[in-house]
Amino acid sequence: IFVYVKLTEGKNLLLLTMMKKEIKFSLVYRDMWQSSGKYQPRVDQLVRIAPLIVEMGCFARVETNGGAFEQVNLLYGENPNKAVRAFTALFREAGIQTHMLDRGLNALRMYPVPADVRRLMYKVKHAQGVDITRIFCGLNETRNIIPSIKYALEAGMIPQATLCITYSPVHTVEYYAGIADQLIEAGAPEICLKDMAGIGRPGMLGELTKAIKEKHPEGLI
């Protein structure tokens, strides 16, 4: 499909700006690991698909573990630690960054995890080949996220702090931008806009991205 676009400074400033920037893609999974069993991959299947992802040549990052990923390993009777090493190996060789999901205060669980265990978790995951951790709290409670940012940095990982997006009179651009300020000030070099339910309004998300970038131009969103 070929699309002809007449470029003018007035009407297509955004497109012109994007053309001057390097665009990278990150492969992120959502509900596959949380759906019915037939869609939950075993480690032998992940290892088989990894070369194809590399061969595509369009991904700078690939999500490889954390959260539901490692719970599925346990359900299959697999060792999550061995699974992480096996799945990340080829991506590391290809120079593709790998990233995981963690639940802040809850780490990879559904209930709070002691601070010393969380600190050790990041060291272990980094040693297993994981570069980035996407840290989120469903309540956007910064006290559940900021300690994990610091622990991840100590372990040599890149902490990607998350804003869980929803739609209500309370959840405004100012609300989210204020949280982003706190997370970036705590050391997070990246911010993720996590629209788990798919109800974020494009206009609001655009305004939020602009607000964060204007105040933190070096940050990655």
Predicted segments, located by residue:
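Short, well-ordered coil/turn segments that N-cap beta-strands
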Residues: K21-I23, C58-A60, R92-T98, G129-I132, ...
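Targeting/processing segments of secretory and organellar proteins
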Residues: T8-G10
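Conserved, mostly hydrophobic/aromatic
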Residues: M32, I135, I191
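Active-site beta->alpha loop and helix N-cap motifs at the rims of alpha/beta catalytic domains
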Residues: G66-I179
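Catalytic domains of carbohydrate-active enzymes, especially glycoside hydrolases
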Residues: R48-N65, V124-I132
